[in-house]
Regions:
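Hydrophobic helical h-region of N-terminal Sec-dependent signal peptides
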Residues: 8-13
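The canonical Cys-X-X-Cys-His
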Residues: 29-37, 94
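Flanking scaffold residues of small Cys/His-coordinated metal-binding clusters
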Residues: 26
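Axial heme c-ligation environment in periplasmic c-type cytochrome domains
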Residues: 42-53, 66-93
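Bacterial N-terminal signal peptides that target proteins for export
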Residues: 1-7
Length: 105
């Protein structure tokens, strides 16, 4: 029983620190200059992006590619400028974090 409680605690700490690390990556990568989680700034809300791609089984790869290469036309006239300075691994981590923010439908 004690071992189970310790393992559960370790899992919770790991999950929490992972989410914190990914949010920190949003800050470090300057994503929050245009996006916020639940409010529209210049670009779409991050949880709105997550909701749009919720049923797309290629969403992780699609969003990671858009982070790196940029894109336009998906959100009206909004343009996502390319972010070539973001590593492939960080682009995937950012995409994974954004997809975790899906709004309740």
């Amino acid at each position: 029983m004690r071992m189970t409680a310790m393992l559960a605690g370790a899992v919770l700490l790991t999950a929490g620190s992972s989410a914190h690390a990914d949010y920190s990556l949003l800050v470090k990568s300057n994503c929050l200059a245009c996006h916020q989680i639940d409010k529209r700034k210049y670009g779409p809300k991050l949880n709105e992006i997550a909701a749009r791609y919720a049923d797309d089984r290629n969403a992780l790869e699609t969003l990671a590619a858009k982070i790196k290469a940029g894109g336009s036309g998906v959100w009206g006239e909004d343009i996502m400028p390319p972010q070539p300075q973001v590593s492939d691994a960080d682009a995937r981590a950012l995409a994974r974090y954004v997809l975790s923010l899906k709004e309740a439908r």
